[in-house]
């Protein structure tokens, strides 16, 4: 290298790759890549980003502090990161057809926290879906900040249909008069009627917040009705079905709300934004605006339906009888299995999912009576209906093997793992 560095170690600082400087961390990263490349990912909240999104996160933007917002920073030298953040904002607004966007939240939980900081006071009553019915920790669950700082009232699902009963939601809202109603969740397989939620919110004078983290990609393409015409404020993650970097975002059509949101995100809840992640968000939003993304989401939904149907033929009970989205809940009680044991057995077979409570579950959260499955990651690597039929039967084989031997059926699991690895080799990552 032709340079003026007096110190050889400084020259290395700017030129030496990770593999040469930290073999322990590099080995961990390589091992994780091998796991992702050779296993089938069915965790509904996970996805696989494009190489471009990954590259954006590994740029010099990680060096830049940029407290504030484009054109209103507390540091100099922000003209270029201003451009990048402005691109992310404009693309987000176009993608979801809304007036205002804040792309700085580090996560979906941070986005939800910022909305509450902006629009509520400690002790206010909030109403969200209970965790066991398919809600999220940040919607008022007792262990979370939202359940500690606010008077959290929780709605569930109908005992017969296992879907949201809007009459029950209305009755609860009329009884408790919440300041905010939260719609959305982390394990809802059916379409949510945001218009009905807004009717209920208006009746009791509540703010309607929609957390669309799981279904943002579906909403972006029109595969699920948008909450933006109905909600006062919408939060989302930027990964999951949106297939971007891990992060959060807040959207609204109300100027007075975005002013409060912006102040709540910074300086209220966060300091400097992660500009390298915001750059990756901009890249992902650009990808989602393309026609290929709609094709992708259509495949995600179709693959989920195919997977659910195969599992039903294998004796699995799918909560609500199917899915309209990217995910499904599998009730394992008919097979006499627990979610934690099923998760472990499937992972031994090369299929990753997560144990998950089902509505009215009597098991503890670390045991559960079900597993949650999703198709976004598998679809991202190219799996179609035929592949998901195979996957459904492999899951059925592993679960049936577990019924035969509750401690694990090594013969079945090893056979399935070999077949999984062979399938994954046909759809390699980042080649």
From Swiss-Prot:
Record's InterPro entries? PyrdxlP-dep_Trfase, PyrdxlP-dep_Trfase_major, PyrdxlP-dep_Trfase_small, Ser_HO-MeTrfase, Ser_HO-MeTrfase-like, Ser_HO-MeTrfase_PLP_BS, SHMT-like_dom
GO-annotated cellular components? cytosol
The gene from which this protein is expressed is glyA2
Marked site, Plays an important role in substrate specificity, at 239
Q: How does it assemble?
A: Homodimer.
Read off the SUPFAM superfamilies from this record. PLP-dependent transferases
Task: State the organism named in the record.
Answer: Vibrio vulnificus (strain YJ016)
Which prosthetic group or cofactor does it need? Answer: pyridoxal 5'-phosphate
Task: Name the enzyme group at the top EC level.
Answer: transferase
Instruction: List the catalysed reactions.
Output: (6R)-5,10-methylene-5,6,7,8-tetrahydrofolate + glycine + H2O = (6S)-5,6,7,8-tetrahydrofolate + L-serine
Q: Which family does it belong to?
A: Belongs to the SHMT family.
What this chain does, per the entry, is described as:
Catalyzes the reversible interconversion of serine and glycine with tetrahydrofolate (THF) serving as the one-carbon carrier. This reaction serves as the major source of one-carbon groups required for the biosynthesis of purines, thymidylate, methionine, and other important biomolecules. Also exhibits THF-independent aldolase activity toward beta-hydroxyamino acids, producing glycine and aldehydes, via a retro-aldol mechanism.
Q: EC number(s) on record?
A: 2.1.2.1
Its annotated pathway reads: One-carbon metabolism; tetrahydrofolate interconversion; Amino-acid biosynthesis; glycine biosynthesis; glycine from L-serine: step 1/1
Does the keyword RNA-binding feature in the UniProt annotation? no
List the GO biological process terms.
Answer: glycine biosynthetic process from serine; tetrahydrofolate interconversion
Q: Where is the signal peptide?
A: none
Q: What is this protein's record name?
A: Serine hydroxymethyltransferase 2
Q: Determine if Transferase is one of this entry's keywords.
A: yes
Instruction: List the molecular function annotations (GO) for this entry.
Output: glycine hydroxymethyltransferase activity; pyridoxal phosphate binding
- Keyword terms, alphabetized: Amino-acid biosynthesis, Cytoplasm, One-carbon metabolism, Pyridoxal phosphate, Transferase
Q: Which residues bind (6S)-5,6,7,8-tetrahydrofolate?
A: 131, 135-137, 256
């Amino acid at each position: 290298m032709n340079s003026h560095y007096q110190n050889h170690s400084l020259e290395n600082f700017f030129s030496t790759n990770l593999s040469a400087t930290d073999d322990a961390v590099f080995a961990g990263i390589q091992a994780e890549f091998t796991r992702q490349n050779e296993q089938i990912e069915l965790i509904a909240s996970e996805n696989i980003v494009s190489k471009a999104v990954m590259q954006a996160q590994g740029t010099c933007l990680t060096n830049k502090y940029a407290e504030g917002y484009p054109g209103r920073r507390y540091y100099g030298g922000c003209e270029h990161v201003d451009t990048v953040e402005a691109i992310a904002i404009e693309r987000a607004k176009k993608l979801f057809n809304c007036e205002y966007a804040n792309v700085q939240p580090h996560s979906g939980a941070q986005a939800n926290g910022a909305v509450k900081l902006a629009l509520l006071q400690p002790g206010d009553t909030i109403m969200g879906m209970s965790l066991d019915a398919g809600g999220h920790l940040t919607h008022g669950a007792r262990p979370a900040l939202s359940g500690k700082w606010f008077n959290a009232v929780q709605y569930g699902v109908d005992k017969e249909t296992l879907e949201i009963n809007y009459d029950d939601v209305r009755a609860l809202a009329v009884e408790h008069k919440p300041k905010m109603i939260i719609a959305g969740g982390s394990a809802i397989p059916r379409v949510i009627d945001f218009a009905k939620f807004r009717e209920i919110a208006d009746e009791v004078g509540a703010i309607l917040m929609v957390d669309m983290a799981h279904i943002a990609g579906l909403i972006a393409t029109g595969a699920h009705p948008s909450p933006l015409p109905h909600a006062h404020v919408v939060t989302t993650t930027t990964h999951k079905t949106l297939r971007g970097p891990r992060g959060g975002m807040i959207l609204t059509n109300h100027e007075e709300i975005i002013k409060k949101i912006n102040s709540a995100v910074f300086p209220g809840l966060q300091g400097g934004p992660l500009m390298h992640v915001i750059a990756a968000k901009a890249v992902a939003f650009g990808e989602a605006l393309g026609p290929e993304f709609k094709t992708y989401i259509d495949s995600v939904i179709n693959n989920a339906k195919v997977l659910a149907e195969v599992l039903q033929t294998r004796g699995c009970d799918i909560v609500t009888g199917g899915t309209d989205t990217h995910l499904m809940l599998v009730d394992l009680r008919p097979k006499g299995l627990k979610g934690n044991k099923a998760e472990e057995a499937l992972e031994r077979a090369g299929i990753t999912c997560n144990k998950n409570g089902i509505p009215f579950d009597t098991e503890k959260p670390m045991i559960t009576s079900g597993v949650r499955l999703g198709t976004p990651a598998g679809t991202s690597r190219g799996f179609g209906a035929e592949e998901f039929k195979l996957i459904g039967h492999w899951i059925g084989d592993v679960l049936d093997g577990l019924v035969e031997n509750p401690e694990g059926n090594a013969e079945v699991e090893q056979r399935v793992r070999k077949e999984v690895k062979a399938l994954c080799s046909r759809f390699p990552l980042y080649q």
